[in-house]
């Protein structure tokens, strides 16, 4: 079973994503501020991260940069920021995908599946 970490401070959105992904067969972990994400990633093998950009204490772009320095886990950004430049900046910083809020749950699921397929293909090619 693939493991997904959701880092989203909005409890309603976090719960909605968690419940939906569990119903679709994923093991889901939740964080609400990302303060301890690196410690968590060193302890638990995660297959994909869903990361909000507007978080308390540390912004998602800083968390993304920290993740990229140490891990190759796919990161799917969810954000209310709709500007093209914001999307470009985050993709260049290391995000693998970007979805604008409000989002369609089926689109989120399709993007997760797509990113996980890509990683599985890359792992098979490297073996």
Predicted segments, located by residue:
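Regulatory hinge/linker segments at domain boundaries
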Residues: 125-127
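N-terminal/domain-start alpha-helical segments
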Residues: 1-123
């Amino acid at each position: 079973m693939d493991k997904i970490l959701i880092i989203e401070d909005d409890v309603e959105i976090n719960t909605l994503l968690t419940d939906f992904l569990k119903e679709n067969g994923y093991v889901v972990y939740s964080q609400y501020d990302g303060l301890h994400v690196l410690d968590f990633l060193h302890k638990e093998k995660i297959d994909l991260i869903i990361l909000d950009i507007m978080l308390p204490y540390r912004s998602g772009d800083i968390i993304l940069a920290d993740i990229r320095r140490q891990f190759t886990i796919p990161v799917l950004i969810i954000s209310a920021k709709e500007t093209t430049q914001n999307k470009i900046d985050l993709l260049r910083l290391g995000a693998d995908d970007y979805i604008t809020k409000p989002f369609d749950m089926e689109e989120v699921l399709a993007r997760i599946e797509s990113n996980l397929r890509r990683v599985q293909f890359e792992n098979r090619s490297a073996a």
